[in-house]
A protein has these predicted regions:
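Structural preference for solvent-exposed beta-strand-turn elements
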Residues: 1-214
Length: 214
């Protein structure tokens, strides 16, 4: 029993895709008096195609399918690095998951999981936030312990505005500029421009001379 989610300034946070996916695995879910009531015996593997990509939806169905009976296919699954690492952790715990980072994830259910250890990947949203802060303040930054391969399209977008970026394997050098060019873009699922950096990019565009559209 959990309360229905709210939202934020960006918009509502519907959970319909989560519910549909879990019901496909055999969960019984109803909405009553502002709460989600869910129950199930052991979940049964199935195939579920997301109408649109959902990061947390993929994560929830992936975790549920891990202990479900039989095989589950998650089609149009999210490909974000965070989903890949979640799957890697589950595999380290005894799960049988294939197709991580691809459009279709296949899960063979197991009876139980055990403990495991994993090193969390660097936060790519925090990295972009720090990069933009450095550009806005016309400063120079050295950002360590990041993974530039997770940021290829955002970094290319930021280069277009006139900032200087130099990336190595786990490090990034940022140098601001007196002339920042306005940049327009559309947010997209990974590997595109993530929605979670549109606010930071909007702030960056406010110091440019010109018009931009997000």
């Amino acid at each position: 029993k959990v309360s229905l989610p709210g939202g934020c300034a960006i918009g509502a946070r519907p959970v319909d895709l989560h519910i549909q996916g879990l019901e496909k695995l055999g969960a019984r879910i109803e909405i009553k008096d502002g709460y989600l009531l869910a129950s199930a015996d052991r979940l049964i593997g199935s195939s579920y195609c997301f109408p649109k990509k959902s990061v947390t939806g993929t994560a929830n169905i992936l975790m549920a399918a891990t202990l479900a009976e039989g095989e589950t296919k998650i089609v149009n699954s999210a490909c974000e690095p965070e989903i890949v690492q979640l799957g890697e952790l589950l595999n380290a715990m005894g799960a049988r998951i294939e197709g991580l980072g691809e459009n279709c994830i296949t899960v063979q259910g197991v009876e139980n999981l055990s403990g495991a250890e994993i090193e969390i990947i660097p936060d790519r949203i925090e990295a972009i936030t720090m990069i933009i802060a450095g550009i806005i303040t016309k400063g120079e930054l050295k950002i360590e312990n990041i993974n530039p391969s997770h940021l290829e399209q955002p970094l290319e977008l930021i280069r277009q505005c006139g900032a200087q970026l130099e990336a190595s394997k786990q490090c990034l050098f940022v140098k601001g500029s007196d002339k920042i060019i306005p940049i327009s873009f559309e947010t997209e699922p990974y590997p595109g421009i993530p929605t979670d950096i549109q606010a930071q990019m909007m702030v960056l565009n406010t110091i440019t001379n010109g018009e931009s559209e997000i």
